Amino acid sequence: TVAIDAGSLDGLEDDMTVINGDGLIGRVLKVFDSTATVVLIVDPESSVGGRVAGSQEIGIVSGTGRQNSLEFQLLDPLGQVASGDAVVTFGSKGGRPYAPGLPIGEVVDVTGTAGELSRVATVKPFVDVSELSVVGVVVKPPREDPRDSVLPNAPSAIPTPAPTPTPSSSQEKETAATPAPSDG
């Protein structure tokens, strides 16, 4: 855990997401008046829902206690994950404790093959927790859940213009007639 110099007087509450310019750092564990305690994602007691960026593959990212290593266990044993894939937060209801779509890290190794009981990937965090200086706390999650943007759009019918009838040479052309005044 680390302490930050913002607390309840600054609007912080328990279970808010903590980030920096590189990605996810952790979550607010406990808030005091002018400070807060943050549990880091690398902490062995830490876990967060994760998703392979650009796909629907989800799993649990857990801290290992090492500053440069996380464990990502896929929920689907047939799921596809490979070295070089980015892992982002899946998100929590109401954005707490984790807002969705935040960068977590890059897959560096995968154990187990598709179809085995479990597939575990080793993830190198984007954030170097040993070099933290300025952090941000997500006080209000995004209005629209970014993970929804990875879902395919519902198919929509493309309107086709209706054909316009044109008179052919064999058809008679109609002419407008104006009624003549009656002598009546």
Put a short name on every predicted segment:
Residues T1-G184:
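A secondary-structure micro-motif
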